[in-house]
């Protein structure tokens, strides 16, 4: 005991600064715990550290932010660490969002934030000004082309027939649970690769093979989130020394580039061998209609299209089924609507006893469309976004914005505000999207932000709805899914609103024909 005491005294004499640091850390931790105990209080603004400790110590960022925005009247100032330019304005006020995306659109470009997402390259996602207008015109030409849409619809139907239905049928026969989120990620990866690169990676098979590209894409987005909550100087130093999340990003970047460049090379080689092929994928469209053959340009745009389609659709469908598990009456209404469509359709398509819904059949599925809207409202695939102010401004809420200041706005929080969506905002209620005449109700994009708003509103919105309705209708009509008992659904702390543990389901064949 004496030896131990002597050693402690010697340590304290020679390294007092370490003891002080340890003591400060313990006190800091206790205070942080106390300060964080109130669910809806504004994060405490610490000397030096600002409010950042409250964010870092919380594992449910979206709910954490929602509670504070509700308490503070939809907007509050987030103070970051001193001298590191990390102050934010947090908001879910629709008038502020309308201001940034419509009324004062030019003052909120991608700007510096484009550097955070530099892996996307120089494309419609990161571009501003004339370059962005040029990208958007080309994207509109592609996404609204009849041949492009027909090609996608045909491939999706075939993918359901040859992959999705057999996998769910097998799961039902073997009574083996499947991760529905993983199924949707694989399905949309296959369909997006075909529509962008004319290639089917066949990731959705009975074997559920590893998909290096998808893993790399997820890692890249996580690294981008890390950049958002890390001082710019720090993440740039990490990039320079190739350590931590920046090292992970660099490795993921190589995987992404290797896959896309290889597919572009294969497509070009095929075209060179057989001449111009009758293909309406996005990359071929750029080459044939716009005479653009630059590999870097094609890579940047291909990556954007791939992620946009894969992530939005897969996550929306995943959360929709979770909502149906919690609201079985909604599923019964969808099923009733689908039965009527099948009974009245002259284009009934069955294969091995399973009904397949095509793009024509689901046009009249109003309640299903409303259910998708409700899933997108409550569970937006991108729960928050960040804007940079080019010049000083004043938001409609009265908050002053400095030039260069960042604004984080939360569609996730907006969906949970009674003053925006009514007293029943927390209910999953597709009926809110249907008028008294039985038609779909329109909500302004700055309120229903799932597809962005203003000049940057998503060009593929209706196409995305059509594709998701085909898939969801085919699953619900042919199968009854139930969440595995005891499975825990938890949001990931990510730029995307994916489920941390997936969505494990049991599958049973349905007899409705």
UniProtKB/Swiss-Prot annotation:
<keyword id="KW-0560">Oxidoreductase</keyword>
<feature type="transmembrane region" description="Helical">
    <location>
        <begin position="14"/>
        <end position="34"/>
    </location>
</feature>
<feature type="binding site" description="axial binding residue">
    <location>
        <position position="458"/>
    </location>
    <ligand>
        <name>heme</name>
    </ligand>
</feature>
<dbReference type="GO" id="GO:0016020">
    <property type="term" value="C:membrane"/>
</dbReference>
<dbReference type="GO" id="GO:0016705">
    <property type="term" value="F:oxidoreductase activity, acting on paired donors, with incorporation or reduction of molecular oxygen"/>
</dbReference>
<dbReference type="GO" id="GO:0009820">
    <property type="term" value="P:alkaloid metabolic process"/>
</dbReference>
<keyword id="KW-0479">Metal-binding</keyword>
<dbReference type="GO" id="GO:0006629">
    <property type="term" value="P:lipid metabolic process"/>
</dbReference>
<dbReference type="InterPro" id="IPR002401">
    <property type="entry name" value="Cyt_P450_E_grp-I"/>
</dbReference>
<dbReference type="Pfam" id="PF00067">
    <property type="entry name" value="p450"/>
</dbReference>
<keyword id="KW-0812">Transmembrane</keyword>
<dbReference type="InterPro" id="IPR017972">
    <property type="entry name" value="Cyt_P450_CS"/>
</dbReference>
<dbReference type="InterPro" id="IPR036396">
    <property type="entry name" value="Cyt_P450_sf"/>
</dbReference>
<dbReference type="GO" id="GO:0004497">
    <property type="term" value="F:monooxygenase activity"/>
</dbReference>
<dbReference type="GO" id="GO:0020037">
    <property type="term" value="F:heme binding"/>
</dbReference>
<protein>
    <recommendedName>
        <fullName>Noroxomaritidine synthase</fullName>
        <ecNumber>1.14.19.50</ecNumber>
    </recommendedName>
</protein>
<dbReference type="GO" id="GO:0005506">
    <property type="term" value="F:iron ion binding"/>
</dbReference>
<comment type="function">
    <text>Cytochrome P450 that catalyzes an intramolecular para-para' C-C phenol coupling of 4'-O-methylnorbelladine in alkaloids biosynthesis, including haemanthamine- and crinamine-type alkaloids, promising anticancer agents. Catalyzes the formation of (10bR,4aS)-noroxomaritidine and (10bS,4aR)-noroxomaritidine from 4'-O-methylnorbelladine. Also produces N-demethylnarwedine as a minor product. Involved in the biosynthesis of haemanthamine.</text>
</comment>
<keyword id="KW-0017">Alkaloid metabolism</keyword>
<keyword id="KW-0503">Monooxygenase</keyword>
<keyword id="KW-1133">Transmembrane helix</keyword>
<comment type="pathway">
    <text>Alkaloid biosynthesis.</text>
</comment>
<keyword id="KW-0472">Membrane</keyword>
<keyword id="KW-0349">Heme</keyword>
<keyword id="KW-0408">Iron</keyword>
<comment type="similarity">
    <text>Belongs to the cytochrome P450 family.</text>
</comment>
<dbReference type="InterPro" id="IPR001128">
    <property type="entry name" value="Cyt_P450"/>
</dbReference>
């Amino acid at each position: 005991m004496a030896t131990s005491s002597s050693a402690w005294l010697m340590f304290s004499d020679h390294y007092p600064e370490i003891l002080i640091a340890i003591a400060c850390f313990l006190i800091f931790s206790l205070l942080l715990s106390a300060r964080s105990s109130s669910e809806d209080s504004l994060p405490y603004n610490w000397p030096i550290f600002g409010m950042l400790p409250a964010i870092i110590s919380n594992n449910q960022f979206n709910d954490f932010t929602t509670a504070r925005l509700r308490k503070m009247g939809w907007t509050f100032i987030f103070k970051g660490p001193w001298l590191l330019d990390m102050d934010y304005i947090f908001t879910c006020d629709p008038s502020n969002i309308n201001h940034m995306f419509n009324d004062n659109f030019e003052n909120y470009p991608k700007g510096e934030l484009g550097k955070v997402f530099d892996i996307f390259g120089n494309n419609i996602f990161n571009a501003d000004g004339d370059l962005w207008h040029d990208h958007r015109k080309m994207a509109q030409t592609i996404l609204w082309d009849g041949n492009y849409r027909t090609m996608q619809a045909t491939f999706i139907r075939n993918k359901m027939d040859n992959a999705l239905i057999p996998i769910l049928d097998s799961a039902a026969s073997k009574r083996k649970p499947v991760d529905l989120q993983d199924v949707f990620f694989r399905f949309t990866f296959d369909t997006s690769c075909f529509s962008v690169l004319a290639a089917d990676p066949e990731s959705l098979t009975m074997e559920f093979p590893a998909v290096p590209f998808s893993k790399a894409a997820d890692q890249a987005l996580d690294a981008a989130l890390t950049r958002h909550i890390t001082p710019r100087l720090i993440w740039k130093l990490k990039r320079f020394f190739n350590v931590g999340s920046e090292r992970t990003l660099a490795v993921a970047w190589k995987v992404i580039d290797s896959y896309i460049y290889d597919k572009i090379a294969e497509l070009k080689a095929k075209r060179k061998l057989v001449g111009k092929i009758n293909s309406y994928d996005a990359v071929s469209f750029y080459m044939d209609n716009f005479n653009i053959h630059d590999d870097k340009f094609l890579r940047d745009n291909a990556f954007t299209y791939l992620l946009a389609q894969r992530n939005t659709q897969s996550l929306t469908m995943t959360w929709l089924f979770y909502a149906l598990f919690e609201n079985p009456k909604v599923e019964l209404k969808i099923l009733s609507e689908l039965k009527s469509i099948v009974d009245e359709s002259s284009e009934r398509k069955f294969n091995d006893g399973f009904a397949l819904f095509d793009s024509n059949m689901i046009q009249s599925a109003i309640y299903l469309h409303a259910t998708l809207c409700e899933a997108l409202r409550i569970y937006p695939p991108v729960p928050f976004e960040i804007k940079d102010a080019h010049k000083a401004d004043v938001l409609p809420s009265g908050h002053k914005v400095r030039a260069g200041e960042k604004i984080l706005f939360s569609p996730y929080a907006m969906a949970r505000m009674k003053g925006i969506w009514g007293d029943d905002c927390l209910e999953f209620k597709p009926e809110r999207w249907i008028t008294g005449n039985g038609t779909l109700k329109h909500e302004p994009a700055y309120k229903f932000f799932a597809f962005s708003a203003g000049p940057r509103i998503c060009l593929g919105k209706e196409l995305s709805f059509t594709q998701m309705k085909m898939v969801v209708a085919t699953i619900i009509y042919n199968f009854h899914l139930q969440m595995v008992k005891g499975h825990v659904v938890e949001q990931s702390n990510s730029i995307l609103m994916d489920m941390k543990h997936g969505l494990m389901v049991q599958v049973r064949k349905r007899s409705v024909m």
